[in-house]
UniProtKB/Swiss-Prot annotation:
Region (Disordered): 281-303
Function field: With CysN forms the ATP sulfurylase (ATPS) that catalyzes the adenylation of sulfate producing adenosine 5'-phosphosulfate (APS) and diphosphate, the first enzymatic step in sulfur assimilation pathway. APS synthesis involves the formation of a high-energy phosphoric-sulfuric acid anhydride bond driven by GTP hydrolysis by CysN coupled to ATP hydrolysis by CysD.
Molecular function GO terms recorded: ATP binding; sulfate adenylyltransferase (ATP) activity
Annotated protein name in UniProt: Sulfate adenylyltransferase subunit 2
Organism, scientific name: Saccharophagus degradans (strain 2-40 / ATCC 43961 / DSM 17024)
Keywords for the protein's UniProt record, in alphabetical order: ATP-binding, Nucleotide-binding, Nucleotidyltransferase, Transferase
Length: 303
């Protein structure tokens, strides 16, 4: 009889993720779900809603706002969270804002450290969260490929890849001392294609930036950067052009490259994913600061 009941691979992934989310809610005193407004966050939030239906997730959402996100992302965030009736904490590094930190002036490494990493650590300390959900997947990037589902962080929020706990089957060690925490990745075993197929299957709402449209872009160092507001300086020799583009990954607009595409629907995006040979994070400028830059950022407290 058991052999007759088989889950599709998407339903298996869904069940695993829901188990992890419920496990965290049961084991930790003060968890939070990081909501970056991207496709992975959208899937993770959808799974959290399913995990506790018909009730609401017993933890708040939190968005670390660098003040450089795409306008459409912020509009979507506020509208969608309101529709779901969830608590949303928005945190920005006020010190960085007062310093006028800008990815254009100070570069991606300094901007990311101050406005993302330090801001995240500030927020986690301020609210005393002992577990934080994130939407990272192992197929995204090499340092994430070796990260546990329960990723242990010390009292300074640092990640030591050599000091992680074994995870046997679906057994997770949630023990932490005061001040320590766990970053939890329920989507660890999903791929980018899985994410898109699940979004299509479940009709999950997304920021329109993921779909191809005519957008004003500038080509800079081989990357198509969308001109999202008047803070973007146009350098000599550069020209703003309207191109049919979409985004495979979303972050701060000056540090996120668009890809030329004609995919305006979910089936077209899935077809594109089946044919692509490049990583979705190829368009993230912060990943190219230096060799192993993502691992270094994570060791400093980055998600």
């Amino acid at each position: 009889m058991l052999d007759e009941y088989k889950l599709t691979h998407l339903k298996q992934l869904e069940a695993e993720s829901i188990h992890i989310i419920r496990e965290v809610a049961a084991e930790f005193d003060n968890p939070v779900m990081l909501y970056s407004i991207g496709k992975d966050s959208a899937v993770m939030l959808h799974l959290a809603m399913k995990a506790f239906a018909p009730g609401k997730p017993p933890f708040p959402l939190m968005h670390v706002d660098t003040t450089w996100k795409f306008k459409e992302m912020i509009e979507f965030r506020d509208k969608y969270v309101k529709e779901l009736g969830l608590e949303l904490i928005v945190h920005s590094n006020q010190e960085g804002i007062d310093m006028g930190i800008s990815p254009f002036v100070h570069g991606s490494a300094k901007h990311t450290d101050i406005m993302k990493t330090q801001a995240l650590k500030q927020a986690l300390d301020k609210h005393g969260f002992d577990a934080a959900f994130g939407g990272a997947r192992r197929d995204e990037e090499k340092s994430r490929a070796k990260e546990r589902v329960y990723s242990f962080r010390d009292k300074k929020h640092r990640w030591d890849p050599k000091n992680q706990r074994p995870e046997l089957w679906n057994i997770y060690n949630s023990r932490v001392d005061k001040g320590e925490s766990i970053r939890v990745f329920p989507l660890s075993n999903w791929t980018e294609l899985d994410i898109w197929q699940y979004i299509h299957l479940e009709s999950i709402p997304l920021v329109p930036l993921y779909f191809a449209a005519k957008r004003p872009v500038v080509e800079r160092d081989g990357t198509l950067i969308m001109v999202d507001d008047d803070r973007m300086p146009i350098e000599p020799g550069e020209k703003v052009e309207e191109k049919m583009v979409r985004f495979r990954t979303l972050g701060c607009y000056p540090l996120t490259g668009a890809v030329e595409s004609e995919a305006t629907t979910l089936p077209e995006i899935i077809q594109e994913m089946l044919l692509t040979t490049t990583s979705e994070r190829q368009g993230r400028v912060i990943d190219h600061d230096s060799s192993g830059s993502m691992e270094k950022k994570k060791q400093e407290g980055y998600f």
